[in-house]
């Protein structure tokens, strides 16, 4: 069995950024939970067709089997007892909510521009996401 590292943190904490850098430094494969859930099927809105939990879990299992040395970025990584043995190391990133929310909104604007602002076609969807992110428990 190789080495699996999970980088956890709430939305906007920097887990993907840190995970990618760590994977590059260690020459490990990088897996982002967001990529498991959201296939790049719609160039206009990449979150349009989310996969189910089971589909994402199966994809993660596949990635782990193919790439035994990996870094996995996920809010919690809660994929059950079957996955836990593949993680040898855990990194938990804790960032203040105001900083995280600023990063999440900034990232949304970078991806979607004016489409996520009032009057834009993605405004309602993104605002719902911001409310969800802000409501997440910090423990």
Tell where the protein language model's regions lie, with residue ranges.
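ATP-binding Walker
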Residues: 13
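A glycine- and Lys/Arg-enriched "phosphate-lid" helix/loop adjacent to the NTP-binding pocket
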Residues: 89, 94-139
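Walker A/P-loop
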Residues: 16
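Walker A (P-loop) ATP-phosphate-binding motif of ABC ATPase nucleotide-binding domains
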Residues: 4
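Conserved substrate/cofactor phosphate-moiety recognition/catalytic segment
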Residues: 20, 24-65
């Amino acid at each position: 069995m190789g080495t699996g590292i999970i980088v956890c943190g709430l939305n906007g904490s920097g887990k993907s950024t840190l995970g990618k850098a760590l994977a590059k430094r260690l020459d490990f494969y990088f897996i982002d939970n967001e990529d498991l859930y959201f296939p790049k099927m719609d160039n206009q809105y990449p979150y349009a067709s989310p996969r189910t939990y089971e589909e994402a879990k199966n994809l993660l299992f596949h990635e782990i089997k193919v790439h035994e040395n990996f870094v996995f970025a996920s809010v919690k990584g809660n994929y059950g007892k079957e996955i836990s043995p593949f993680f040898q190391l855990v990194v938990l990133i804790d960032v203040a909510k105001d900083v995280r929310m600023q990063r999440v909104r900034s990232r949304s604007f970078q991806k979607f521009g004016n489409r996520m602002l009032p009057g834009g076609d993605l405004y309602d969807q993104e605002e719902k996401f911001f409310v969800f992110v802000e409501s997440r428990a910090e423990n």
